[in-house]
From Swiss-Prot:
CDD domains: PT_UbiA_Cox10. The chain crosses the membrane at residues 38-58, 65-85, 108-128, 131-151, 158-178, 186-206, 251-271, 287-307. GO terms for cellular component: plasma membrane. Its EC number is 2.5.1.141. This is Protoheme IX farnesyltransferase. It catalyses: heme b + (2E,6E)-farnesyl diphosphate + H2O = Fe(II)-heme o + diphosphate. Converts heme B (protoheme IX) to heme O by substitution of the vinyl group on carbon 2 of heme B porphyrin ring with a hydroxyethyl farnesyl side group. It comes from Bacillus thuringiensis (strain Al Hakam).
Length: 307
């Protein structure tokens, strides 16, 4: 995109800057919604590591604090850096054109500096737990900022797969804070669930926002290969979730039943998409289901440990 085009988009964005508070702008800068949802997976990893190592949360409240704050700062930091990196294409998309780095509420230099500072501060907090937690945090940050935001996002349709690696790391951060060996198979099942779940989740979003991604020049799968291939890919990845609960028998039969029912429900909804004429409506249904799926699944993992 040339400078003239960029300036035109900047001007159009400025004319419709929404009224926001400083706190709202800060939340948008660090993508607080993403931080909050990922904090659930961090806590789940932490909680299950305590459970399977026979440890008490009351004896590890300090580690819980350092883990939640540290991982939250790391995630907020990389989201800041992503806003900085994407400031040229965000004005082209409806869902991102009101970000504070687009509207001018925060200057690019501030977003870059603030992102780096809180990212490093997050690593310091994680270091107060275990070095492995720091390593997991670094892997997640490097994958999201460098491999996804700077490299694959604007070049390859596999950008979704690459980005899903970083989104699968948070439960490992939580687990590593208690058990740095990461030797329990359930720790890696959490990683696999998060990795696989993100792909149909974000492909459904890409279908819903296909015109925006096309205008921004981002080669999402539905932009490059169309809806039919995207729907097939969504189904393949959704089906891949089906066997995973059976490798988590340590959480008991109740969890396995809940997880399997959630998987079957998602698969049934997915197959319905091949009969439905309104692909956009179906993609929204798949996206909403994926959000509920993740919340119910991870909350269930915690709840079943009480029985």
């Amino acid at each position: 995109m040339n400078h003239a085009t960029s300036e035109l988009h900047d001007e159009s964005a400025v004319t419709s800057i929404p009224e926001t508070t400083r706190l709202q702008d800060l939340k948008a800068l660090v993508k607080m919604g993403i931080v909050n949802s990922n904090t659930l997976t961090v806590f789940t990893g932490f909680w299950l590591a305590l459970h399977f190592n026979g440890l008490s949360v009351l004896d590890n409240l300090d580690k819980l604090f350092f883990t939640i704050v540290g991982s939250g700062l790391v995630m907020a930091g990389v989201c800041c850096l992503n806003n900085y990196i994407d400031r040229d294409i965000d004005p082209l998309m409806e869902r991102t054109k009101t970000r504070p780095t687009v509207t001018g509420k925060y200057k690019p230099g501030f977003a870059l500096t603030f992102g780096l500072v809180i990212l490093l501060l997050g690593f310091v907090f994680l270091l107060l737990t275990t070095p492995m937690a720091v390593l997991m945090g670094f892997i997640g940050a490097f994958t999201y900022v460098v491999l996804y935001s700077l490299w694959t996002k604007r070049k390859y349709t596999l950008n979704t797969v690459v980005g899903s690696i970083s989104g699968a790391v948070p439960p490992l951060i939580g687990w590593a804070a208690i058990d740095p060996s990461l030797g329990h198979p359930i720790a890696w099942m959490l990683f696999l669930i998060m990795f696989i779940w993100q792909i149909p989740h974000f492909l459904a979003l890409a279908m819903k926002r296909v015109d925006e991604y096309r205008n921004a020049g981002i080669p999402m799968l539905p932009v490059v290969h169309g809806f039919e291939i995207t729907k097939r890919q969504i189904m393949i990845w959704t089906v891949c979730l089906l066997p995973l609960p059976f490798y988590m028998s340590g959480l008991g039969i109740t969890f396995m039943v809940i997880a399997t029912l959630l998987n079957i429900g998602w698969i049934v909804l997915g197959f319905y998409g091949f009969r439905k004429k309104d692909d956009i409506k179906w993609s929204v249904q798949m996206f909403v289901y994926s959000l509920n799926y993740l919340t119910i699944l991870f909350v269930s993992m915690i709840v079943v440990t009480f029985f």
